[in-house]
């Protein structure tokens, strides 16, 4: 009975009543003894009483029936209600199958099979991204965070799983430097890997919050206007949550040539869209690579897959003279996208943004407002645009300069819902939704980003 967070079943001639209460009580926050196994905890009838009261209304016989056993036991819940499976990214050879969120028995056969295959072959036998341990973020081991979040995730098992439903607890951990400015403009935030991201913008006088529904939700018209602004004028997205990985050293080029399906041997300042493949030709990483110098490259990956992609890089690092660094927090990303993007940037920058001076697929250092940025001419929405990589300490200024000048160019602040609809309209892939490690790069329609003539690379034999 999801509305009452309860379940009923016959058990050895008796009625068993259990529950996934909406607000759970964290246990073991101070540590769990090494010899602990599943056991009974002290009775906590006050905590269970609201569930029992609703059960009596549903089954009045319970009011006179005696309670044979009141069992209170612990169960493991993760921050996102999915279990952890796979090799720990920090420790090679350390395999994990944990956090089963009360579905351990039903998952055991499949999870055991998948993990055994993964351990034996070195690759998961099929797409396991939803339960892959590499989705976990380093900050999620913080006990204060866990105490707050798991009090909610248990109850979500029996809650309505509305599209785009956001967690309510343990929020605000990772924020863009312009978080408060976006909030003042009506941003309604969603969470991804701890990042607070503007998903859509409420109009003046509109309550800036989700109203969940199985039908069109309250943000639909807002998102439509944002989408049209990107198509017809210019939109501004805060994509600071992009994962940013710096790969540098004298062996950086051959290291990336072995991992990437596209050709990394390009001039400094060039941007290359590529995938990293497994031995089956499946897609392990979907990214852009910008060559910064002869020995330095910047990899831009989805924020949700950053830990996965870092683990993939480090797993394949041998004796090469290469340093891999997560530089995500050092730069913000402001995406100026739409037919008027060039005119807007030209209004606040002395640099030349023409096709001749700044062609597609190149990155250049620019002046903007009173700040500096690195402008990448790429697009994830299918329109003319630039991604501006700005030092975190200058982001607020650059944002204000763009907004102030934007009124003359039809600028509209846009959220992630609009980014998603635009990239779907253009058929741009998104890892975890459209492509995974079990999707062959050619079957995914990404053969244009595969260069077999460049020489050997992981997955070449499969394509």
Task: Describe the predicted segments one by one.
Residues 9, 17-20, 97, 400:
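Beta-strand scaffold of nucleotide-dependent catalytic cores
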Residues 17, 24-27, 104-106, 199, ...:
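A short local loop/turn or secondary-structure capping micro-motif enriched for an aromatic residue
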Residues 126-463:
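Glycine/proline-enriched, intrinsically flexible loops and inter-domain linkers
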Residues 11-13, 22, 89-91, 294, ...:
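Short strand-connecting beta-turns/loops that link adjacent beta-strands
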Residues 1-3, 12, 25-174:
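C-terminal catalytic lobe of FAD-dependent flavoproteins
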Residues 12-15, 21-24, 74, 101, ...:
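Glycine-rich beta-alpha junction loops
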Residues 16, 84, 93-96, 298, ...:
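General beta-strand recognition
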């Amino acid at each position: 009975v999801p509305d009452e967070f309860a379940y009923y079943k016959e058990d050895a001639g008796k009625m068993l009543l259990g529950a996934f209460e909406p607000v759970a009580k964290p246990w073991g926050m101070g540590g769990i003894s090494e010899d602990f196994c599943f056991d009974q905890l002290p009775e906590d009838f006050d905590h269970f009483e609201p569930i029992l009261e609703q059960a009596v209304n549903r089954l009045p016989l319970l009011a006179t029936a005696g309670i044979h056993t009141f069992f209170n036991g612990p169960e493991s819940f993760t921050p996102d209600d999915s279990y952890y499976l796979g090799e720990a990214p920090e420790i090679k050879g350390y395999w994990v199958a944990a956090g089963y969120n009360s579905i351990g028995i039903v998952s055991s056969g499949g999870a055991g099979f998948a993990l055994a295959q993964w351990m034996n072959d070195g690759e998961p036998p099929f797409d396991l991204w939803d339960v892959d341990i590499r989705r976990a973020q380093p900050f999620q081991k913080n006990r204060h965070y866990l105490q707050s979040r798991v009090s909610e995730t248990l109850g979500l098992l029996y809650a309505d799983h509305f599209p785009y439903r956001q967690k309510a607890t343990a929020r605000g951990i990772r924020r863009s430097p312009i978080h408060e400015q976006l909030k003042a403009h009506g941003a309604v935030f969603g969470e991804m890997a701890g990042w607070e991201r503007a998903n859509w913008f409420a109009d003046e006088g509109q309550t800036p919050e989700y109203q969940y529904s199985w039908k069109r939700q309250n943000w639909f018209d807002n998102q439509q206007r944002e989408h049209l602004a990107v198509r017809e004028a210019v939109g501004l997205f805060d994509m600071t949550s992009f994962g940013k990985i710096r790969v540098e050293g004298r062996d950086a080029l051959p290291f990336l040539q072995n991992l990437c399906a596209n050709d990394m041997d390009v001039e400094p300042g060039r941007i290359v869209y590529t995938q990293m493949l497994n031995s089956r030709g499946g897609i392990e990483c979907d990214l852009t690579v910008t060559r910064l110098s002869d020995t330095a490259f910047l990899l831009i990956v989805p924020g949700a897959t950053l830990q996965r992609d870092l683990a993939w890089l480090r797993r394949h690092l041998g004796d090469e003279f290469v340093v891999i660094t997560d530089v995500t927090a050092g730069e913000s990303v402001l995406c100026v996208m739409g037919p008027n993007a060039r005119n807007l940037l030209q209004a606040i920058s002395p640099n030349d943004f023409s096709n001749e001076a700044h062609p597609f697929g190149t990155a250049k250092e620019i002046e903007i407002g009173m700040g500096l940025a690195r402008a990448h001419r790429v697009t994830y929405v299918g329109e003319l645009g630039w991604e501006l990589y700005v030092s975190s300490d200058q982001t607020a200024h650059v944002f204000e300069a763009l907004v102030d000048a934007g009124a003359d160019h039809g600028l509209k602040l846009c959220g992630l819902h609009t980014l998603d609809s635009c990239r779907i309209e253009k058929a741009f892939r998104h890892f975890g939704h459209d492509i995974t490690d079990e999707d062959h790069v050619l079957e995914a329609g990404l053969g244009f980003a595969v260069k077999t003539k460049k020489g050997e690379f992981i997955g070449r034999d499969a394509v």
